[in-house]
Amino acid sequence: MSNPRSLEEEKYDMSGARLALILCVTKAREGSEEDLDALEHMFRQLRFESTMKRDPTAEQFQEELEKFQQAIDSREDPVSCAFVVLMAHGREGFLKGEDGEMVKLENLFEALNNKNCQALRAKPKVYIIQACRGEQRDPGETVGGDEIVMVIKDSPQTIPTYTDALHVYSTVEGYIAYRHDQKGSCFIQTLVDVFTKRKGHILELLTEVTRRMAEAELVQEGKARKTNPEIQSTLRKRLYLQ
């Protein structure tokens, strides 16, 4: 019987290029520039090559993701990881472009999946979404079926289309996202602070982001509000950024 392997060994190889794409609608979104500055600082510190586009239309959101995918697949050097940061007004499942038209998030996620981006197959793809997902506001609270048989193979020759992806939303489904008109968004500023000052795999870092946001109290129009991010992961290994 072979000795069990430590989970610490199961981590993504980050020796290749690290790439990031930032798409941000600044129109009628005061505080966006502070978020952009913070993200640029974070990506420099984490040794990412970052590309930024301000005020994309709905169509340009899709076009920029496709251009990013093509640039990744055409690189001669190996790519280890890709980040995509999307910041705009929105509602559940959609972002609003600078032109007021909507683009479906699901379509944006398609560009870098294991089927459409060969260079990122089995590589981590992280999406950071700073946008409202509804109209609700959280005031805070005081503190069987049929059996399914699963067969595991030691050396799989194929992987699912949507593995190795991490979607991080600034708020939970149905709720608005908060942004200060001078200091930027609570979510982006907290994420940058944790990612640049703390070490650990990315899900540990995001747990710390969630803790800080959940414990913070926001005030909007004189009323106390609470908020926390939502994390959806299909990562198969640990992802360390530093």
UniProtKB/Swiss-Prot annotation:
- Active site as annotated: H89, C132
User: What residues make up the propeptide removed on maturation?
Assistant: 1-5, 147-152
Q: What is its EC number?
A: 3.4.22.-
Q: Which InterPro entries match?
A: Caspase-like_dom_sf (IPR029030), Caspase_cys_AS (IPR033139), Pept_C14 (IPR002398), Pept_C14_caspase (IPR011600), Pept_C14_p10 (IPR002138), Pept_C14_p20 (IPR001309), Pept_C14A (IPR015917)
The record ties this protein, via CDD domains, to: CASc (cd00032)
Protein location: Cytoplasm; Nucleus
Activity regulation (UniProt): Inhibited by caspase-1 inhibitor YVAD-FMK and the pan-caspase inhibitor VAD-FMK.
Q: Name one GO cellular component term.
A: nucleoplasm
Q: In which tissues is it expressed?
A: Expressed in keratinocytes of adult skin suprabasal layers (from spinous layers to the stratum granulosum and stratum corneum) (at protein level). Expressed in keratinocytes of hair shaft and sebaceous glands (at protein level). In psoriatic skin only expressed at very low levels. The p17/10 mature form is expressed in epidermis stratum corneum, the p20/p8 intermediate form in epidermis upper granular cells of the stratum granulosum.
Keyword set, alphabetical order: Cytoplasm, Differentiation, Hydrolase, Ichthyosis, Nucleus, Protease, Thiol protease, Zymogen
Care to name a GO molecular-function term for this sequence?
cysteine-type endopeptidase activity
Post-translationally, this protein is described as follows, namely: Maturation by proteolytic processing appears to be a two-step process. The precursor is processed by KLK7 to yield the p20/p8 intermediate form which acts on the precursor to yield the p17/p10 mature form. Initially, cleavage between Ile-152 and Lys-153 has been proposed to yield the large and small subunits of the active enzyme.
Q: What Pfam families has UniProt attached to this entry?
A: Peptidase_C14
Q: What induces it?
A: In undifferentiated keratinocytes under postconfluency growth conditions (in vitro). By high glucose in retinal pigment epithelia cells.
What Gene3D superfamilies does the record tag this protein with? 3.40.50.1460
Q: Which GO terms describe its biological process?
A: cornification; epidermis development; keratinization; positive regulation of neuron apoptotic process; proteolysis
* Summary of subunit composition and partner proteins: Heterodimer of a large and a small subunit, both processed from the precursor; the mature active form is a p17/p10 dimer and the intermediate form a p20/p8 dimer.
Report further notes: Expressed in bacteria requires high concentrations of kosmotropic salts to be activated. The mature and the intermediate form differ in activity towards synthetic caspase substrates: the p17/p10 mature form but not the p20/p8 intermediate form is active on WEHD-MCA; p20/p8 is active on a number of other caspase substrates without any marked preference (VEID-AFC, DEVD-AFC, LEVD-AFC and LEHD-AFC).
Its job: Non-apoptotic caspase involved in epidermal differentiation. Is the predominant caspase in epidermal stratum corneum. Seems to play a role in keratinocyte differentiation and is required for cornification. Regulates maturation of the epidermis by proteolytically processing filaggrin. In vitro has a preference for the substrate [WY]-X-X-D motif and is active on the synthetic caspase substrate WEHD-ACF. Involved in processing of prosaposin in the epidermis. May be involved in retinal pigment epithelium cell barrier function.
Q: Which disease is it linked to?
A: Ichthyosis, congenital, autosomal recessive 12: A form of autosomal recessive congenital ichthyosis, a disorder of keratinization with abnormal differentiation and desquamation of the epidermis, resulting in abnormal skin scaling over the whole body. The main skin phenotypes are lamellar ichthyosis (LI) and non-bullous congenital ichthyosiform erythroderma (NCIE), although phenotypic overlap within the same patient or among patients from the same family can occur.
- Please give the family membership noted in the entry: Belongs to the peptidase C14A family.
What is the official name of this protein in its record? Caspase-14
